[in-house]
C-alpha cells in the first residue's frame, strides 16, 4: 500500500489533529518526568528530545510507521552488502570501512575486509613517512603543507573533520582544501605555499571529475613553474582514485594511489582513503579513533531497540515535522566553533540523499521528502537568523549540538556559550506570553498607547521544537559517533519515504549542460542553441571575454 494511504500514516494524521494545539510548556507542567521519558544517552552522547511536540502516543505511532517500512530488514541488507542502491546496482558499505579487524565479508567474490585492511595499512605507512619527514620533496625538504583537491564528498567530509578536530592535530603539517573550480579558490590557497614542501592529494574516484581535474592540472602547472622536471610530480602528488591509468598518465606513481570502491558513496567517503588528509593532519591513530566512534554508533543502530535507538528517534521526529506539521527545513546549530562546517557537511549528506521526488518503484510521491538543511554555529547564528526561528511564520525544527568540555577554556567563555545554547532551547519552547511581555514593558516604564503599540512585537509564540545533542567532549571518537548518528538518521528516513537515498541523479543534468556550454564560449557566431535567456547570458559573457565593451544601459541616464 502507498505510504500516505497506509493505516500507520492515517493514524499519525489523526493524532496530529489532537496534539498540534498542545503547548509543550503545558506538557512539561503535567509530567515532571518528561525529560527522563524523552532523552537517552549512548557512550558520551546525550540526546534530549523532550522539547518536541510529542507524547508517548506520538512516539508509539512513529515507531509503528518505521516498522511498517521494514526498517529492520533494510538495515540488515545494508550492513550485509546487498545492492540497496538499486539504480546503480551497488552495495552501500561505508559501515564496512570502520569495522575493527577480524570480520569477514565477501562482495562479488571480493574479500571486502581484506581490501579495506590493505588500504588502511597503506594509509598508515604513508602517514608515518610524511609526518616523520622520511618522505621528502624533490629538493630533499620535508613536507609542511598538504593540499586536498576534491569536490563534494571528497572535500566536505575531510574539511569538516579537520576543522572539528584541530586541537588533536600533531602540528607537523598544515592541511588546505581546494574544491571550487573558481580559480580564486586555488590561487588563494596556494598563495604563500612553497612547491618544495607541498604535497597534493587529488581525490577523484574516476579521475575525470571536471572541477577536480581542472584544479589538479593548474596545481601541477604551479608546481612545475619552480620544479621544472615533470619527474618531480611523483614526489608531490598522490591520488585517491580507482583509475590507475589516468593517475599514471597525470604523473602520479601508481604505488601512491589509494583506492576505494564503488560501494562507497561520495558523501559517505571520509571513512575511506578519501580521509587521507584527515589521517595526515591528525595522525593515523586519531583517524582510527574516528572510525571506532562511527563503528560504535553502527553497533548501537544495529542492536538498540527502536524506541531506544538514537538514529531511529531523530529520523522519525524529522518525519513528524516534515510530513505532518509541514516544516520543510531544519536548522543545525552547533554551539562549538570547531563544528562550523558541520551544517554544510550535513547539507550534502541529507539533501543529496533524500532530495528525491520518486519512490523506489519510479512513482512520484505525494508527500514531502528531504528537508532543506541549514545552519551556522552559535552564538553567531543568534545574531543572524534566530529572529525568524523565534517570531517567524514558519516552524523550523532545530538540532542544537554542544560539548560539555571546551578545548580552549578562556575565562567564562564556555559557560556563556553553553548558557546561550540551553537558553535558546528553552526560549523556543516556552516563548513569551502577553502577560509576561506586558509586565516587562510596565517595569520599563511604558504605559497606555505606547505600551499597547509595542506589545505585539514583544510576544514570542514558543512551542518551537528542538533537540539538544550533548557531547561530553568533541574528540575523534565522539565526532565519529556524531557523524554516523546523522548518516543512519538519513538512511531511516529514506526507507520510510521509500526512496533510494544512495544515488544522486539530480547532480547530473547541470553538469551535462555545462559541458555543452563551455565550447560555445569560443564560437564565432552568436549562440542561439538554447532558450532566449541562456543564449543572452552566454553571449554577454562572450562579449566580455573577448574584450568588447558592453552597451551602456539607458538607466545610466537617470543618475
Swiss-Prot record:
Gene3D superfamilies found in the cross-reference section: 1.10.1390.10, Glucose-6-phosphate isomerase like protein, domain 1
Reaction catalysed by this enzyme: alpha-D-glucose 6-phosphate = beta-D-fructose 6-phosphate
Any matching Pfam family: PGI
Residue positions of the active site: 352 (proton donor), 383, 511
Domain of life of the source: Bacteria
EC numbers on record: 5.3.1.9
GO BP field: gluconeogenesis; glucose 6-phosphate metabolic process; glycolytic process
Function: Catalyzes the reversible isomerization of glucose-6-phosphate to fructose-6-phosphate.
Protein family membership: Belongs to the GPI family.
Protein's UniProt name: Glucose-6-phosphate isomerase
Natural source organism: Chlorobaculum tepidum (strain ATCC 49652 / DSM 12025 / NBRC 103806 / TLS) (Chlorobium tepidum)
Species lineage: Bacteria, Pseudomonadati, Chlorobiota, Chlorobiia, Chlorobiales
Gene: pgi
Amino acid at each position: 500500500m502507498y505510504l500516505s494511504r497506509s493505516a500507520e500514516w492515517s493514524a499519525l494524521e489523526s493524532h496530529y489533529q489532537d496534539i498540534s494545539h498542545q503547548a509543550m510548556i503545558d506538557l512539561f507542567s503535567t509530567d515532571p518526568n518528561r525529560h527522563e521519558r524523552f532523552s537517552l544517552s549512548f557512550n558520551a552522547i546525550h540526546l534530549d528530545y523532550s522539547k518536541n511536540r510529542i507524547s508517548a502516543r506520538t512516539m508509539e505511532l512513529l515507531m509503528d510507521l518505521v516498522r511498517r517500512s521494514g526498517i529492520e530488514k533494510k538495515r540488515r541488507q545494508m550492513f550485509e552488502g546487498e545492492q540497496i542502491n538499486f539504480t546503480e546496482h551497488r552495495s552501500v558499505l561505508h559501515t564496512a570501512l570502520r569495522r575493527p579487524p577480524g570480520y569477514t565479508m565477501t562482495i562479488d567474490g571480493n574479500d571486502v575486509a581484506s581490501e579495506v585492511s590493505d588500504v588502511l595499512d597503506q594509509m598508515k605507512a604513508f602517514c608515518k613517512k610524511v609526518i616523520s619527514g622520511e618522505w621528502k620533496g624533490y629538493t630533499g625538504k620535508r613536507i609542511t603543507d598538504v593540499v586536498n583537491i576534491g569536490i563534494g564528498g571528497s572535500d566536505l567530509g575531510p574539511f569538516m573533520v579537520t576543522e572539528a578536530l584541530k586541537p588533536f592535530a600533531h602540528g607537523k603539517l598544515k592541511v588546505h582544501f581546494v574544491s571550487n573550480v573558481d580559480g580564486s579558490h586555488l590561487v588563494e590557497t596556494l598563495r604563500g605555499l612553497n612547491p618544495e614542501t607541498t604535497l597534493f592529494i587529488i581525490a577523484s574516484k574516476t579521475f575525470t571529475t571536471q572541477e577536480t581535474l581542472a584544479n589538479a592540472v593548474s596545481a601541477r602547472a604551479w608546481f612545475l613553474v619552480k620544479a621544472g622536471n615533470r619527474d618531480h610530480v611523483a614526489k608531490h602528488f598522490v591520488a585517491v582514485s580507482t583509475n590507475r591509468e589516468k593517475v599514471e598518465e597525470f604523473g602520479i606513481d601508481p604505488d601512491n594511489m589509494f583506492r576505494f570502491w564503488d560501494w562507497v558513496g561520495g558523501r559517505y567517503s571520509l571513512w575511506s582513503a578519501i580521509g587521507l588528509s584527515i589521517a595526515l593532519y591528525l595522525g593515523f591513530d586519531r583517524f582510527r579513533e574516528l572510525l571506532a566512534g562511527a563503528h560504535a554508533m553502527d553497533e548501537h543502530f544495529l542492536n538498540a531497540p527502536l524506541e531506544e535507538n538514537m538514529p531511529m528517534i531523530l529520523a522519525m521526529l524529522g518525519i513528524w515535522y516534515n510530513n505532518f506539521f509541514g516544516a520543510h527545513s531544519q536548522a543545525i546549530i552547533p554551539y562549538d566553533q570547531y563544528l562550523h562546517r558541520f551544517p554544510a557537511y550535513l547539507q550534502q549528506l541529507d539533501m543529496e540523499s533524500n532530495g528525491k521526488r520518486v519512490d523506489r518503484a519510479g512513482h512520484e510521491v505525494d508527500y514531502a521528502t528531504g528537508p532543506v538543511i541549514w545552519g551556522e554555529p552559535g552564538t553567531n547564528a543568534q545574531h543572524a537568523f534566530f529572529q525568524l526561528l523565534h517570531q517567524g511564520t514558519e516552524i523550523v525544527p532545530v538540532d542544537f549540538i554542544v560539548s560539555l568540555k571546551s578545548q580552549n577554556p578562556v575565562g567564562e567563555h564556555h559557560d556563556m556559550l553553553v548558557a546561550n545554547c540551553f537558553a535558546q532551547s528553552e526560549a523556543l519552547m516556552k516563548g513569551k506570553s502577553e502577560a509576561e511581555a506586558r509586565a516587562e514593558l510596565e517595569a520599563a516604564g511604558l504605559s497606555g498607547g505606547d505600551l499597547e503599540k509595542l506589545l505585539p512585537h514583544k510576544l514570542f509564540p514558543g512551542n518551537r521544537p528542538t533537540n539538544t545533542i550533548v557531547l561530553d567532549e568533541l574528540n575523534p571518537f565522539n565526532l565519529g559517533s556524531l557523524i554516523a548518528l546523522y548518516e543512519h538518521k538519513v538512511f531511516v528516513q529514506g526507507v520510510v519515504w521509500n526512496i533510494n537515498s544512495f544515488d544522486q541523479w539530480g547532480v547530473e543534468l547541470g553538469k551535462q549542460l555545462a559541458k555543452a556550454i563551455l565550447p560555445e564560449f569560443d564560437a564565432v557566431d552568436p549562440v542561439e542553441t538554447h532558450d532566449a535567456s541562456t543564449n543572452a547570458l552566454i553571449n554577454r559573457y562572450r562579449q566580455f571575454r573577448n574584450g568588447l565593451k558592453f552597451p551602456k544601459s539607458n538607466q545610466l541616464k537617470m543618475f
